[in-house]
Amino acid sequence: MTKDISKNESVVFDVQGLNLWYGEDQALKNIKMQIKKNKVTAIIGPSGCGKSTFIKTLNRMIENIPSVKTTGEIIYQGQNIFAKSVRVEELRTKVGMVFQKPNPFPKSIFANVVYGPRIHGIKDKKLLMDIAETSLRNAALWDEVKDRLHDNAYGLSGGQQQRLCIARCLAVQPDVILMDEPTSALDPIATYKIEELMESLKKHYTIAIVTHSMQQAARISDDTAFFLMGDLIEFDKTTEIFSNPKDKRTEDYITGRIG
């Protein structure tokens, strides 16, 4: 069961009848949901349910796999993202991605953050430094690295590397941040810092996060979507999903009876 929870709230993604196949295997089945502006939407479900596939479809990153084919629409900024007129590079700038494992480039901390702006033609050193500082501040990392910006990013801890990847994403001024299990490789303290950061970031960005942790979804998200075997079983406000699920399969999953 999916509920329309978008009344009086701005919709960033309107997903309409989305189907996706890997070759002959269907991974997403007639997905219909809306992701709201300046909210955190959690995508939950057991391994292989389609949640990572879904989130990677929102900026068409899934198309890097040759066998993928899709039907349906994802409306973003009034346009179907699958339309031929959509430039994928621009879409991925506006809809950034943070992955499960921190993936800094083998460059300095500074060079990591300004990599995107440089690709987009920004060369002015002062402007690049301003972008780096702003992005690192917004990723809650500036105070920890401001005196070693030209050190190799590999010298950072895992949690710091993940926040650096978030800063790198922010540097190109996205509207949306997609996160695919961003804390699964981190310790509890680093996880807490990322979760605290998400609460701050949603004031300016829309966030969708895939997580295996029910506790994390309950803590950080405003809305939650439960996927099972490629189907969207239930989508509602997080408080409703965890306190009053409408579908027994949702209840069974969040209470540990399936998954």
Swiss-Prot record:
InterPro entries hit by this protein: AAA+_ATPase, ABC_transporter-like_ATP-bd, ABC_transporter-like_CS, P-loop_NTPase, PstB-like
Organism name: Desulfitobacterium hafniense (strain Y51)
Main location: membrane
Keywords: ATP-binding, Cell membrane, Membrane, Nucleotide-binding, Phosphate transport, Translocase, Transport
One Gene Ontology CC term in the entry: plasma membrane
Gene: pstB
Catalytic activity, EC: 7.3.2.1
Subunit text: The complex is composed of two ATP-binding proteins (PstB), two transmembrane proteins (PstC and PstA) and a solute-binding protein (PstS).
Entry similarity comment: Belongs to the ABC transporter superfamily. Phosphate importer (TC 3.A.1.7) family.
Protein name listed in UniProt: Phosphate import ATP-binding protein PstB
GO molecular function, one term: ATPase-coupled phosphate ion transmembrane transporter activity
Regions that span the bilayer: none
GO biological process: phosphate ion transmembrane transport
Task of the protein: Part of the ABC transporter complex PstSACB involved in phosphate import. Responsible for energy coupling to the transport system.
Record-annotated ABC transporter domain positions: 6-254
Membrane topology reported for the UniProt record: Peripheral membrane protein
